[in-house]
Amino acid sequence: MTNIRKSHPLMKIVNNAFIDLPAPSNISSWWNFGSLLGICLILQILTGLFLAMHYTSDTTTAFSSVTHICRDVNYGWIIRYMHANGASMFFICLYMHVGRGMYYGSYTFLETWNIGVILLFTVMATAFMGYVLPWGQMSFWGATVITNLLSAIPYIGTSLVEWIWGGFSVDKATLTRFFAFHFILPFIIAALAIVHLLFLHETGSNNPTGISSDMDKIPFHPYYTIKDILGALLLILALMLLVLFAPDLLGDPDNYTPANPLSTPPHIKPEWYFLFAYAILRLIPNKLGGVLALVLSILVLMLMPLLHTSKQRSMMFRPLSQCFFWILAADLLTLTWIGGQLVEHPYIIIGQLASIMYFLLILVLMPVASMIENNLLKW
C-alpha cells in the first residue's frame, strides 16, 4: 500500500517541506527563528481577525472601538495585547533571523535572501500601518510625520503625499485605507514566505560551519519538529509574560490620548522596533538625505552578497569578522536608544557617530576584515 503522505498531491508538498526534508545535522537554535516567524505571523493574522470584527476604521469611532474591545468584548483585552506585543515578538525574531543570516553567510542564497529583505520591508510597512489604527496621539502624529517624508521626493513628492493621505492631511480617508492595507498585507507576507521557503528548499539549509552538509543530513521530522515546538513554547511563554504582566511596557502612553490634530505631542517617536531607523533618519539635517539614509539602512542588506570578500562562508572561524559583527549589534542597540531620546546634546552627536558607524561597518570594515583574514590564512 502506498503511503498517502508520499502519494497525495497536497500531502506530498507538506511531506517534502516539513517531514522528509533532509536537514543538516548540526543547525543550532539560531535556525529556530524561521519557524517562530511563521508562528508569529499566524498568531498576528488570527488575533488581528478577531480585532477587525470589533474595530471601526472611522476617525470619530476608531479610538473608542479599541477601548470597547478592551472593556466590553469577551477577552478583548488579551486579544488586543497579544496582537500589539505579538508585533514586538515578530520583530525580535525578525532581527535575530537576519542577524543569523549575516553571521553564518546565509545571504549567499541570493533569491532566498532578497525575498527575505522584501519580506522585512513588507512587515515594517504592515506594522507601521497597524500602529496608526488605534487613532491615539502617537498614531496620528506618527502617520503624519512618516508619510510626510515622501514629500522629500523631488517633483512628485507633495502630490504623492496628498494621494496617500486622500486629502490635505491625515484624516478619515487615510485611516480607512491604512486599515484596508493592514488587513491585506499579512496575506501577501504569507505568500512571500512560501516563496522564501520554496527558494530555500531549492538549495537546502545553510549550517553554522558554512560548508556543504550533503554528506550528513537527517530528516526534519522528528528532530527539528521537536526542536521547533520547544522554540514555539518559549516564544509563547515570553509573549504571555509580556501580555499578562506588562502589556504596556513597550507601548507609548501618548497613544492613550485620542488623536488631536491641534496638539502635537512633545516627542513623536515610532514603536521601539523602528527606533534604529528613525534615529538614522532624523540625525541627517537634510530631509531628502534623511529619507535616503532611512531606506538604505534596510536596503543595504541586499548588498551583503556583493560585499562578501571572505573565502569562508560563515563567521564561525573568523574572529575579526565576529568582532565587527558584534560591534554592529551593539551599534544597532545604541541607535535604538538614541531614537527614543530627545534631539539635543549629547544625543545628536552620539546618534550621528552611530549612524556613520552602522554604514561604515557593513560597507567597509566587515569586507576589509574578511580580506585581512584571507591574507592571514594565506588564501
Curated annotation (Swiss-Prot):
Record localization: Mitochondrion inner membrane
Name of the protein: Cytochrome b
Binding-site residues, heme b b562: H83, H182
Cofactor(s) the protein requires to work: heme b
Chain sites annotated for binding a ubiquinone: H201
UniProtKB keywords: Electron transport, Heme, Iron, Membrane, Metal-binding, Mitochondrion, Mitochondrion inner membrane, Respiratory chain, Transmembrane, Transmembrane helix, Transport, Ubiquinone
Gene Ontology CC annotation, any one: respiratory chain complex III
Chief location: mitochondrion
CDD domains (alphabetical): cytochrome_b_C, Cytochrome_b_N
Role this protein plays: Component of the ubiquinol-cytochrome c reductase complex (complex III or cytochrome b-c1 complex) that is part of the mitochondrial respiratory chain. The b-c1 complex mediates electron transfer from ubiquinol to cytochrome c. Contributes to the generation of a proton gradient across the mitochondrial membrane that is then used for ATP synthesis.
Additional free-text comment from the UniProt record: Heme 1 (or BL or b562) is low-potential and absorbs at about 562 nm, and heme 2 (or BH or b566) is high-potential and absorbs at about 566 nm.
Pfam families: Cytochrom_B_C, Cytochrome_B
Transmembrane region(s): 33-53, 77-98, 113-133, 178-198, 226-246, 288-308, 320-340, 347-367
Family: Belongs to the cytochrome b family.
Binding site for heme b b566: H97, H196
Recorded topology in the membrane: Multi-pass membrane protein
Cofactor note: Binds 2 heme b groups non-covalently.
BP-aspect Gene Ontology terms: mitochondrial electron transport, ubiquinol to cytochrome c
PROSITE patterns: CYTB_CTER, CYTB_NTER
One Gene Ontology term of the molecular function aspect: metal ion binding
Top-level taxonomic group: Eukaryota
Subunit structure: The cytochrome bc1 complex contains 11 subunits: 3 respiratory subunits (MT-CYB, CYC1 and UQCRFS1), 2 core proteins (UQCRC1 and UQCRC2) and 6 low-molecular weight proteins (UQCRH/QCR6, UQCRB/QCR7, UQCRQ/QCR8, UQCR10/QCR9, UQCR11/QCR10 and a cleavage product of UQCRFS1). This cytochrome bc1 complex then forms a dimer.
